A protein has these predicted regions:
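TPR alpha-solenoid repeat register
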Residues: 45, 80, 113-114, 147-151, ...
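TPR/TPR-like (Sel1-like) alpha-helical repeat modules
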Residues: 127-146, 156, 160, 171-174, ...
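Short coil turns that delineate tetratricopeptide repeat
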Residues: 38-41, 75, 108-109, 141-146, ...
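Canonical tetratricopeptide repeat
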Residues: 48, 83, 116-117, 154
């Protein structure tokens, strides 16, 4: 008889739990209330009941009671601890709130839980407790699953000292440093970016380096030559395409002049602007630029920023060959400075059906940056060109 009773009790328990599960899935206030009564040891039932009570405007005491039942049933249910913590904070019980949020962070090491605790410390001006939690959150490193920018922004509200933020909050995790560099550039905080760049280049993987290129571009656009060169050289020291670091005072600086590597389209490498009617293709240590006759009358088709010594005289050397491009068409090298526009040179239009050597003399501007451009300006009285040019063996020499 004892066995029969035990079997019956087991069947009853199974049926009761199955019915409770059915009621839980119905997801109404009434059904989940009954489910929690049938299975009081199920923490998820109590947590969901607390949520529905809140949504239905029920009293705070009933909600907290269900949350307490949830953590009693499962002390590692972080969501319930978080709700208890936030409710305690809302009623001015800061110590109880902190205790609950700390319990949540111990039970669940996910970013959202740590973010909630970091936010609590920020709201209560407890910076010494904020920094370790912020760093723990960022060390998770899964920036594809969450956006760390709000936490970066919180760090800058806690302190405006870039060194403090970098040392106390930003871990040596490549993806996190990459996102932090993106944040600094986007928020116009570039002056704080240089040490971040150095650490990102040191600790990041190849897939993390794109923000360094964007940062370098931003510095070039702002005319901050020295910092742009420093960022670029950090990439070169990392082994970027086998490129040599730039040192305009010691040697002429032109990158990838033999086109042995695909241009990265950033920094001090070649860029091929997107122009309707024009295509660029690297092939056989040459850069081929094709014009289909429908290109704009004025367009830049190949360019590179040069790091030059101020007021020094330079000679650009190159080899080229054209197909179906007439003399005097308006296709030539031009050199620009960010401050004053095009600078004087002895550049001539390019047209030669056989491979030939060309050169352009120019004097560097007062600044350190110049922009070398292969540019088309349709000559009056001519039709738009329909042909191609191959550029190779580009080098820059300083006049001794």
């Amino acid at each position: 008889m004892a066995g029969v009773a035990a079997l019956a009790a087991g069947c009853y328990t199974t049926a009761r739990l199955a019915w409770a599960d059915y009621l839980f899935r119905s997801d109404t206030l009434e059904s989940i209330t009954r489910a929690a009564q049938l299975a009081p040891a199920d923490a998820e039932y109590h947590l969901r009941l607390a949520t529905l009570l809140d949504a239905n405007g029920r009293g705070g005491a009933a909600i907290e009671s269900e949350l307490r039942r949830a953590v009693d049933a499962n002390s590692r249910l972080a969501a319930a601890w978080i709700e208890l913590g936030l409710r305690a904070e809302a009623t001015g019980q800061a110590q109880q709130a902190e205790a609950a949020l700390v319990r949540a962070a111990r039970a669940d090491h996910m970013y959202s839980t740590l973010w909630t605790l970091a936010n609590f410390y920020f709201r209560h001006n407890e910076s010494e407790k904020f920094w370790p939690v912020a760093r723990r959150a960022l060390r998770i490193g899964d920036v594809a699953a969450y956006d760390p920018a709000p936490l970066f922004r919180l760090c800058w509200k806690v302190s405006t000292d870039p060194a403090t933020i970098l040392e106390r909050a930003i871990p040596d995790v490549g993806p996190v440093e990459a996102r932090y560099l993106e944040f600094l550039v986007r928020e116009n905080l570039s002056p704080a970016a240089e040490p971040v760049t150095e650490r990102l280049v040191a600790f990041g993987g190849e897939q993390d380096l794109h923000p360094v290129f964007v940062y370098c571009d931003r510095l070039i656009a702002a005319g901050e030559a020295d910092r742009a060169i420093h960022a670029w050289n950090a990439l070169c020291w990392r082994g970027l395409q086998g490129y040599r670091p730039l040192d305009p005072d010691a040697a002429p600086s032109l990158t990838n002049g033999d086109f042995s590597a695909p241009p990265v389209q950033h920094g001090f490498d070649w860029r091929t602007p997107s122009v309707a009617g024009v295509t660029a293709e690297r092939f056989g240590l040459r850069m081929w630029i094709n014009f289909n006759g429908h290109e704009p009358e004025t367009c830049d088709v190949l360019e590179q920023y040069l790091a030059v010594a101020p007021s020094r005289r330079y000679r650009l050397r190159f080899r080229y060959q054209t197909d179906d491009i007439a003399a005097g068409s308006g296709l030539r090298w031009r050199i620009f400075t960010p401050a004053t526009g095009e600078i004087a040179s002895d550049a001539a239009d390019l047209a030669s059906e056989v491979e030939t050597q060309g050169s352009v003399w120019f004097t560097a501007p007062a600044g350190v940056l110049a922009r070398l451009v292969l540019s088309y300006r349709r000559t009056p009285g001519t039709t738009r060109i329909e042909g191609r040019i191959a550029i190779q063996s580009v080098s820059l020499e300083a006049d001794q």
